[in-house]
Amino acid sequence: MPAHRHLVPQRASKGHLRLTEGELRHWGEDLGRAATPPLLITLTGELGVGKTTLAQSICFGYGVKEEITSPTYALVHEYVAAKSPVFHIDLYRLESPEQLTNLGWDEIVSSRALVLVEWPERAESRLPDDHLPIDLDYTADDPTRRILLAG
């Protein structure tokens, strides 16, 4: 059983949750409070689905005091928390997996930190096997987000 299995809520039916935006924020905070480093969480989903909102909530629950902003242009933001550093990485603008080396990818993912990665599919095979994947989805006529957890 993966070390992060305790982070998947019992109410998840077959690994799925349906949450409003407010519930997503609360769940993210709970996830952050329960997270134990080292932990890499990947956040996938279309633009505007709530990946950064969830990352902000996880960071808040984890104890980050700073304002959490999207790292779309900087690619990586590092934050301080009592448990460990937090790296929030957005790979949307990454043009090739080779650029990960310039970001310090290997050092970050092997560190004793909480690592949140948006657009992880751009990292291809360089993701560690023991990460927690979270996939977010929504439809325009439904105010909830569908969360798929693989744990």
Regions found by a protein language model. Give the residues of each.
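Switch II (G3) loop of P-loop NTPases
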Residues: 86-96
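Conserved lysine of the Walker
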Residues: 51
